[in-house]
């Protein structure tokens, strides 16, 4: 039972990875949308696999590295969603460009959230877990 979250997240990561690759072979989508869906699926896979493995490890340092990988997926997913929504909704090019540029603020936030001082790791009831420390970013 301790590995329930790990198994579920790893399965979701594999499915998202498959979905990402399969999206490239879809014949009816525009080329740009195919690639945006690919990046969305790939980011989701990285997010799920990073946090899925985090629950299974018993070392705080490895858990920290898994969280860093998982957070790459989180921010990649959010950036991909903004790009995809702008494309699908047919927003004017100027508005899309503003939102696309602003979405990369997440990259700066990422580097603030993955600092080792921003979280502490411990073995909980369901496996390794973490808590965030209070600070400007958290």
Language model region names:
Residues 1-16, 28-125, 135-138:
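Individual alpha-helical transmembrane segments in multi-pass integral membrane proteins
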Residues 17-23:
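Alpha-helical transmembrane segments
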